Amino acid sequence: MGFWENNKDSITSGLKSAGKYGYQGTKYVAKTGYKASKKHYNNSKARRERKSGKKNSSDEEYDSEDEMEYERKPTDIRSLKDPKSFPPPPLKPGQKTYTGQQQQQMPNGQASYAFQGAYQGQPGAGSTEQSQYAQPQYNQYPQQQLQQGVMPQQQQLQQGVVPQQPPIYGEQVPPYGSNSNATSYQSLPQQNQPQNAIPSQVSLNSASQQSTGFVSQNLQYGTQSSNPAPSPSFQNGLQCHQQPQYVSHGSTNLGQSQFPSGQQQQPTTQFGQQVLPSPAQPQQQQQGQPLPPPRGQVILPAPGEPLSNGFGQQQQQQQQQQQPLNQNNALLPQMNVEGVSGMAAVQPVYGQAMSSTTNMQDSNPSYGASPMQGQPPVGGQPPVPVRMQPQPPQPMQQGNIYPIEPSLDSTGSTPHFEVTPFDPDAPAPKPKIDIPTVDVSSLPPPPTHRDRGAVVHQEPAPSGKIQPNTTSSAASLPAKHSRTTTADNERNSGNKENDESTSKSSILGHYDVDVNIMPPPKPFRHGLDSVPSEHTTKNAPERAVPILPPRNNVEPPPPPSRGNFERTESVLSTNAANVQEDPISNFLPPPKPFRHTETKQNQNSKASPVEMKGEVLPGHPSEEDRNVEPSLVPQSKPQSQSQFRRAHMETQPIQNFQPPPKPFRRSQSSNSSDSSYTIDGPEANHGRGRGRIAKHHDGDEYNPKSENSTENGRLGDAPNSFIRKRAPTPPAPSRSEKLHEGTITSEVDSSKDANKYEKSIPPVTSSIQAQQSTKKAPPPVVKPKPRNFSLKANEYPKELTREATGQDEVLNSITNELSHIKLRKTNVNLEKLGGSKKVKDSSPVPSDLDEKYVSASGSITPPRPPPSRSSPKKVPPVVPKKNDNLKKKPPVVPKKKPLLKSLEPRPIEMERAYSGDISAADDNLNPFERYKRNVVPQEDDRLHKLK
């Protein structure tokens, strides 16, 4: 059975179902798309025909559907919810009232209007809004003035008249004890009419103002007396009279209706928006409820507010208002005329006639939030009419004033806004979780590592080496002792911990893990086992709190002589007692380089006269006692010496430094004692000009196995020779004497080297010597010296010992003795050298002679080449010619070029053969010249031959 036989039923059924549903879906999509496209086509066709004046009845259904779908009708404001039904908006943290809103309790305990007086604070309430609101408001003034006898604002500003006009709709506003809602808009049927007459902008503004909390009275801005606010001068007059005043709060608030009785305040007339709540509304607004400024509205200060607040806002806003007022001057005159006629009987003119003001105040409370609100009308003014009496405010939540859309009937451009009501029963947003601050001082110390205590208990840590346990948390920075430390130490560390942790209380939590980790081991140093152990055993138990290694600023005692071991030990013991741990700088000098001992064993016990000549001076016999060879120091304390020396290296003057060991030279032992006087060829050739004759034993002076006391005493003077070198030198001999001295010294060297080479057996060098010898370029091979030259019985002449007196005589005697011998590698005899200037140039005075003689005589020459092994009879070649014989002279290059030009072209084979002949000799030729010769084209040669 194949796969198809087993699964064909399921496959076919799946394909059928898939095809079925796929067909259905495709059909549905196709139908829907067709209908949509047809509908769209019909709609577009209807629009085109409508524009062209044609319209088919068959398209009406589509048109009607389109109108229902696409054309949005303005929402009736009356269908919206009462803004009082909304809870007050939430306040920001720490905010008690909204910006610019000020609430004032009326004398009778009723809440006064929370007038909105900070129009400046609203960024959107700019001059544009002011001008927009001002203009429709002025358009609204004529109607209001005709109906209500309202005096236009322009006239008020110019004349200082306070048009306090009651809403004249033939109705009397019930006293404040009555419900303001019932009295306000229901009792004012005419409000809607003037509102309708108001431009859309005014309606929008009024709607937004109604939403501020005056909606409860349905105060239509045009309908109710939109009293323009007086000018600042008028405000001043009002304040002087202590009568209800129009407080023009900038362009936004033309004035706030202030009741002479002080109990009621009419809604503020904002210049652009002029919110005119009915006299009954102020109480309804909210007791102590801040009125959020409506869109584009300014929050006027409460009437009971001090004059400073009212005037400050008024003047500021009036300054802002000047421009929109000036723009509306054209409308104002007409309104002024009508307003004056209407206000003549009703409203008094401040500053003009007190009777008129009294009448006006009687009819309508003065607009403007002045601190004089609570005062009764001035001078014989009749009490406020009953309709002007405050009505009992409806209970409202504080701050329950939302800028809700106006409820105007105008079907114009009133936008539709809906505010989602705030559910007071909804659970308040949960505050942020307050993480309790824990006193870190009460917390246990951070845990320590489990392995730290045991290790520290077994072996005390080095003094000053227990480093603070630095962890990621800053609270654990204080160093923790091991658990095995004393109780006092633990208490001290715990107190320090608590002190530091309290300052860093951000670290919370409890830590139970022990983190007393063993401090890391000290860096490995050779031979430090004994010294640190002594320090740690002495100082570790005394440490209360782990501290960093102390740095000793005290200058250590002067360094002892390198051989004075007892003094070194005493200084080290005192130093260890003072310092918990040796400073890092107290390193011992490095171990002495290994020196082969064969030459030491074969050397005589007596000091070399040549060496004594360079080092031993009369009057300094005690330097041997002061300088004992450091190799005699027991090797058990090498590191203590190194540490001590390193401690005093910085304080010791440079002049007192010991000379560094000389680089290892393969010494060749000799059976005779004259080997101690010789200088190796490498040293002679590669000397540094420091008087190597006097110090040629420095290479052997550091042999740790040498125990020859006389040798040690002799070698002890070597370091001091450097110090003495800086002292004033003895008087220099004459030139001739210096010259003889230099030549004699070189000849003595050559003779001793020859004897040593012949008589000595090359010592077996160790691997250390091989490594040290390979560090530098191998010195030239030392060739044997002439056999016929030797001093008497190979004894070094004692006359060579340099002394302060008789120095010239010794040199002269040596010169006479060696005058018959020719100098090595030169044809110059010593007899011919007397006073000749030639010696300065050709005399092979070794460059490694003492500077006292070589540099002063001016006969320094380049290093000598190694002596040849030829017989002594063979005259050595002149030194200047040796360099020319080292390599073959290349063929003269200039002669090749003219040959190339003069020769006729040859075949390439001949050219190659010719070039091959000279290839060995023309290594220095320009390779491009040879290249050019080889690449001469063969065709050119043929053509040339044909010619």
From Swiss-Prot:
Interacts with RVS167. Residues 379-395, 862-879 have a biased composition (Pro residues). InterPro entries: Aim3. The modification Phosphothreonine is found at T729, T861. Keywords: Membrane, Phosphoprotein. Residues 1-334, 354-810, 824-904 are annotated as: Disordered. It is a peripheral membrane protein. Residues 59-69 have a biased composition (Acidic residues). Disruption phenotype: Increases frequency of mitochondrial genome loss. One of its GO terms (biological process) is barbed-end actin filament capping. It comes from Saccharomyces cerevisiae (strain ATCC 204508 / S288c) (Baker's yeast). The keyword S-adenosyl-L-methionine does not apply. Signal peptide: none annotated. Residues 70-84, 488-502, 749-759 have a biased composition (Basic and acidic residues). The keyword Membrane applies. This is Altered inheritance of mitochondria protein 3. Pfam families: AIM3. One of its GO terms (cellular component) is membrane raft. It is found in: Membrane raft. Residues 177-255, 354-367, 466-475, 633-644, 763-774 have a biased composition (Polar residues). Residues 36-54, 888-899 have a biased composition (Basic residues). Belongs to the AIM3 family. The modification Phosphoserine is found at S57, S58, S64, S476. It comes from the Eukaryota.
